[in-house]
């Protein structure tokens, strides 16, 4: 859809602001590459940009209102504003409303259509407002430019969309059905990332372990086969993946954790709740016991694996006793890190129309208790790492002279001082643990 408005000069500088998940970070990087390929330059820190792309997230409540707040803050002191594009999942879900409520927005583009961003920006500069929220994911990836320079850690989207339809979640409606990118495309993009400087690649998907394809010999493979193929790249030192669903943890993927040295001992495997009635109401298609049994198999394959999870407190109808089941599950697992949220009703999802919504004050109290338990376990995991010697991938400089920051194999933030360069793999002895990071020294 398009409409006419007064024309403005073609933008020469841009800024992409991404919110939310790691896939949004990946999408934001690809949008920046698209714009740079058209001859535009990224605006420096503190500089005004001719074009601002708000790459939005729709998972949490009030996401749409946050977009309008961000749009308002883009108006400059002299009353002018940059050309504004709204991208991402809020654009997908609320695109027409954004165009109606925010005349300063010239472009609305969904997460499966952002390959069209350059031509939509050109139309906007010529006075045409436009909205594009189709879902041609395959066409999107085919149209994106080749990867060039990369940081030491890089994201690679291998799968998009979700077919699980958890009752609280908007992803199937904003990202669409599950699609897997072709094996050959992923191997090519990974090689380009490594050639550009990446030493660690995180494979991304809304349901990443549902990825399926055929290898270069036409044989059907899953995510474990893709990881094995990427591990053959000599200069790629580490492989991670996120986010996974328990029902798609195959025997092959579990085995890969015990067999592939480059597949890091870290797994983000959300459970969301520890009570079976709540899990059924969420349409999670697993029980607390089946989740725990799965973790036993994973730990048997890789005993030192660090586990991460997601939790929702206050799902409609959740009782005090049912919440206590979640706390018991947390105690039994001992997560290395995890993320917890209050239930947030999303328009259009089945859970939004369920009865017996939990009062906010009750959700607040449950979240506080759950987060305290998760923080306790994260600190305990970090303290148990003290005395270990491990490889750390150096990602950036620290706040202090001579200090470096990087990640351990277990995704812990590690800071140390000494001779190093960004992108180096260095051996570090872990000497002191805090709740969110570990200090070390070069071994």
From Swiss-Prot:
Q: Which residues form the TRAM domain?
A: 383-443
Gene Ontology CC, one term? cytosol
- Entry's family note: Belongs to the methylthiotransferase family. MiaB subfamily.
Annotated MTTase N-terminal domain residues: 12-126
- What does the record give as the reaction this protein catalyses? N(6)-dimethylallyladenosine(37) in tRNA + (sulfur carrier)-SH + AH2 + 2 S-adenosyl-L-methionine = 2-methylsulfanyl-N(6)-dimethylallyladenosine(37) in tRNA + (sulfur carrier)-H + 5'-deoxyadenosine + L-methionine + A + S-adenosyl-L-homocysteine + 2 H(+)
EC number(s) given by UniProt = 2.8.4.3
The protein here is known as: tRNA-2-methylthio-N(6)-dimethylallyladenosine synthase
Cell location: Cytoplasm
**Keyword annotations from UniProtKB, A to Z:** 4Fe-4S, Cytoplasm, Iron, Iron-sulfur, Metal-binding, S-adenosyl-L-methionine, Transferase, tRNA processing
